[in-house]
Swiss-Prot record:
One of its GO terms (molecular function) is pyridoxal phosphate binding. This is Serine hydroxymethyltransferase. The modification N6-(pyridoxal phosphate)lysine is found at residue 222. CDD domains: SHMT. Keywords: Amino-acid biosynthesis, Cytoplasm, One-carbon metabolism, Pyridoxal phosphate, Transferase. It is found in: Cytoplasm. It is an enzyme of class 2 (transferase). Its EC number is 2.1.2.1.
Length: 424
């Protein structure tokens, strides 16, 4: 068979882009060689509908062992009693939890997308906002932070069946214990979506949802530094609160309800090559080396935020507790879209992002989101954050000057071009 030169040339082009640029998208990271090797292995050939020991296909003896290792490592990493490693993505994990816990039309309470939430937390363009009745909490105009008393007021008024504690562009830690008190006060299931800070949470660097939330979902990339995929967990299994029973008349455990919601409820065959890569990534995350990495991600983010503030950039909430920051650019007279496009020309990748109380459309936005997981994987430290922010500032202040953009691109290439992708 002829090699598909067109595609493989483009793969090399993308590899060169990643090597020579500064990757600051908060949801992106670089995986290790062994994670990539597992993801590209012969396991992609195997169909394995069902769960370990209970498959609908023969020949699953090996993938059963691999999937069970992934499950056990996920439980060890987060201190969970239950883990399902089959969701193809974080969105699929959330879809499965919603289907397990809700009926169409039920009320949910999530973080407003325009304030830092995620599409799957009730956005009207997403399944979560179409199948269910979404209500929202957001940040305070003065502080850019959550006000838990107001969240309680909203929950009391709206009486949601499910509350989602999680975000995609919120730079502060979340009080999961307070969220649980709010959920209990209205009889709601509490789901934490920790897709962004999962790696930091796993190593004890941020508040732990496991003791407080009924169900936890996450992606397996981002700060966990694994393949693109999803994960569902529970700190403790419990009897489903809706009285669903087995054919023998016993109350189904929530673990069984969730498993059934993933397969056959929302997915068919699991991606066993990706599950193997998840297992490898979980194994890496269990090490002391990963703890040092996660700490450095956090240190780099704090150093970067301080450097932005020093240059009169408005960071929503004034700083960061995790791996990211959301920057309101309105005082710099540039839109998020313009900033993103100019930075790409300078070999710096960020994403435009709405900011709370934004007056621009989601396609233009007033802000950018910036994160440190990927550049930390490449070995950059606190002292490098000042240099990076200086690059960004130079681009933003001269975003229409092609000569300066090229000058910054050359400086970025000099900084990153000889540096390995996976260092830390």
């Amino acid at each position: 068979m002829l090699r598909d030169q067109q595609i493989f040339d483009l793969i090399i082009e993308e590899q060169d882009r990643q090597i020579h640029g500064l990757e600051l998208i908060a949801s992106e990271n670089f995986v290790s060689d062994q994670v990539m090797e597992a993801a590209g292995s012969v396991l992609t050939n195997k169909y394995a509908e069902g769960y370990p020991g209970k498959r609908y296909y023969g020949g699953c003896e090996v993938v059963d062992v691999i999937e069970q290792i992934a499950i056990d490592r996920a439980k060890d990493l987060f201190g969970a009693e239950y883990a399902n490693v089959q969701p193809h993505s974080g969105s699929q994990a959330n879809t499965a939890v919603f289907a397990a816990c809700l009926k169409p039309g039920d009320t949910i309470l999530g973080f407003d997308l325009s304030h830092g939430g995620h599409l799957t937390h009730g956005s009207p363009v997403n399944f979560s906002g179409k199948l269910y009745n979404p209500t929202f909490y957001g940040v305070e105009p003065e502080t850019g932070m959550l006000n838990y008393d107001k969240i309680q007021e909203i929950a009391t008024k709206e009486q949601p069946k499910l509350i989602i504690a999680g975000a995609s562009a919120y730079s502060r830690d979340m009080d999961f214990e307070r969220f649980r008190k709010i959920a209990d006060s209205v009889g709601a299931i509490l789901m934490a979506d920790i897709s962004h800070p999962a790696g930091l949470i796993a190593k004890g660097l941020m508040n732990d949802p496991i003791p407080h939330c009924h169900i936890i979902t996450t992606t397996t990339h981002k700060t966990l530094r694994g393949p693109r995929g999803g994960l569902i967990m529970m700190g403790k299994d419990f009897e489903n609160p809706w009285g669903l029973k087995t054919p023998k008349g016993e109350i189904r455990m929530m673990s069984h309800v969730l498993d059934m919601s993933v397969f056959p409820g929302n997915q068919g065959g699991p991606l066993e090559h990706i599950i193997a890569a998840k297992a490898v990534a979980f194994g890496e995350a269990l090490t002391d080396e990963f703890f040092r990495y996660a700490m450095q991600v956090q240190k780099n983010a704090k150093a970067m935020a301080a450097a932005f503030v020093k240059r009169d950039y408005h960071i929503i909430s004034g700083g960061t507790d995790n791996h990211m920051m959301l920057i309101d650019l309105r005082n710099k007279n540039i839109s998020g879209k313009e900033a993103e496009n100019a930075l790409v020309k300078a070999e710096i990748t960020v994403n435009k992002n709405m900011v709370p109380f934004d007056d621009k459309s989601p396609f233009v936005t007033s802000g950018i989101r910036v994160g440190t997981p990927a550049i930390t994987t490449r070995g950059l430290l606190e002292e490098d954050m000042e240099t990076i922010v200086a690059f960004i500032d130079k681009v933003i202040m001269n975003h229409t000057n092609e000569e300066i953009l090229e000058e910054v691109a050359d400086a970025v290439n000099e900084m990153m071009g000889e540096r390995a992708i996976f260092v830390f």
